[in-house]
């Protein structure tokens, strides 16, 4: 640890244990709707009307540990709950359920001065380096603002520290009196870094800190963050959707989907041998800058379900290419993968109406499954085929076919009936994958 910039040399906590621990942390939001939204009538009760507000389950039952000095990368598609989790960790948002332990103390038990002191040990770097800096303030004032809030140093000491931090993040201390508009995006993010470090934190949540920067600038800022981590003994929770950024800076990686952590592993182990289908799909979607690469890269199919009503069991199952066959039916050869593909094509309506024989040829190579599964498939084909005998208009018949297939097959899969959670053998410490393929 370097010399003059540490304000507290005596850190009293067990460095062998986790610096931060989340135990079943959830964050749900009430969904704003119309005046009568959620109104329910029950004549057997008094009063007969009740209002149930829909809840957005942004983060659901997350349990992870972050060790002193490491960088835990948190990756996932936009809207999966990454930023909400980061803000909940810092108690910028209050958790709906669960406990957050920092240096062994439950943050829920802290208030007043104790919480204020703890917050000086936990800082955040925001995504947009422009909107996160007050354009009316000078750079020096911006960096000194957290120190003033926590009554650190006198005016002269704060100015000296701000100038020293400017130098540490790669800026000229003579820029102390400039305003943010005089700086580029990369330079503004360095100012954000200096501000976060001003109160000498142990833990920093980095919320997409380089996503708004040009690729040519990203590596420079990441290298600065790594150097500062070594110099100040920092621990990072690094949130990003760019896997190349995550691979650059992380020690371990947690993959998030629709509020759940679906995989957690050491960086190299996760990138070289992903164990969750969602992780594999993310990695396969990375563009390969190789003109000899003529095969198409993997693309995640289907839409992300609503966090208001997430799927039961595994939340990725509605898009998973490896949805497990329901045990209630006998499957041979490729019959289940073909049935699964047909079910999803009907649900997403990705093919034009056609005769039944052509549907069988395209999806089942002319031989649909037999037995009870075959009867269900035949009924669904009859509903959507142009020569089918089912009654009703076309939209109703497609909806009926979708419901039949999903209720008979998708909802009967173990992927729908049970939430998966498996600790896997690993040569690189802890490894977790929330996938029933590891039963």
Model feature map: region roles:
Residues 1-18, 31-47, 267-434, 439:
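Charged, flexible cofactor/metal-binding loops and thiol motifs
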Residues 38-47, 105-106, 157-174, 283-284:
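Conserved ABC ATPase "signature" region
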Residues 209, 213, 217-295:
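P-loop NTP-binding/switch modules centered on Walker-like glycine-rich loops
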Residues 200:
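Conserved catalytic motifs of ABC-family nucleotide-binding domains
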Residues 51-53, 107-123, 149, 269-274, ...:
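ABC ATPase NBD coupling module
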Residues 98-106:
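Conserved ABC transporter NBD signature motif
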């Amino acid at each position: 640890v370097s010399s003059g910039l540490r304000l507290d040399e005596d850190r009293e906590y067990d460095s062998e244990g986790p610096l931060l621990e989340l135990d079943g942390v959830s964050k749900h939001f009430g969904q704003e709707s119309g005046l009568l939204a959620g109104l329910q009538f029950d004549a057997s009760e008094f009063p007969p009307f009740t209002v149930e507000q829909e809840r957005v389950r942004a983060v659901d039952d997350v349990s992870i540990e972050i060790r002193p000095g490491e960088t835990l990368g948190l990756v996932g598609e936009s809207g999966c709950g990454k930023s909400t989790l980061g803000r909940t960790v810092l108690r910028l948002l209050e958790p709906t359920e669960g406990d957050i332990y920092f240096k062994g103390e439950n943050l829920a038990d802290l208030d007043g001065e104790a919480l204020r002191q703890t917050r000086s040990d936990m800082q955040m770097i925001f995504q947009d380096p422009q909107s996160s800096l007050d354009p009316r303030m000078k750079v020096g004032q911006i960096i000194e603002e957290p120190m003033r809030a926590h009554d650190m140093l006198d005016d002269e000491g704060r100015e000296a520290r701000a100038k020293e931090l400017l130098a540490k993040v790669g800026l000229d201390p003579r820029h102390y009196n400039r305003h943010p508009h005089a700086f580029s995006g990369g330079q503004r993010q360095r100012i954000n870094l200096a501000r976060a470090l001003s109160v000498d934190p142990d833990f920093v949540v980095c919320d997409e800190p380089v996503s708004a920067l040009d690729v040519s600038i990203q590596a420079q800022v990441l290298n600065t963050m790594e150097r500062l981590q070594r110099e100040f003994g920092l621990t990072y929770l690094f949130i990003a959707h760019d896997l190349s950024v995550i691979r650059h800076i992380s020690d371990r990686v947690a993959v998030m989907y629709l509020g759940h952590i679906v995989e957690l592993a050491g960086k190299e182990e996760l990138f070289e041998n992903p164990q969750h289908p969602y992780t594999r799909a993310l990695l396969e979607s990375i563009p390969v800058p190789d003109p000899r690469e003529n095969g198409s890269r993997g693309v995640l199919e289907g839409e992300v379900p609503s966090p208001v009503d997430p799927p039961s069991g595994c939340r990725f199952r509605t898009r998973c290419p490896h949805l497990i066959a329901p045990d209630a039916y006998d499957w041979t050869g490729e019959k289940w993968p073909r049935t699964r593909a047909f079910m999803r094509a009907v649900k997403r309506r990705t093919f034009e109406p056609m005769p039944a024989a052509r549907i069988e040829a395209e999806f089942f190579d002319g031989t649909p499954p037999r037995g009870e599964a075959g009867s269900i498939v035949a009924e669904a084909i009859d509903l959507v085929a142009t020569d089918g005998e089912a009654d009703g208009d076309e939209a109703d018949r497609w909806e009926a076919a979708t419901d039949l297939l999903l209720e008979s097959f998708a909802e009967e899969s173990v992927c729908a009936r049970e939430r998966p959670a498996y600790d896997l053998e690993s040569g690189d410490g802890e490894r977790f994958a929330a996938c029933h393929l590891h039963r």
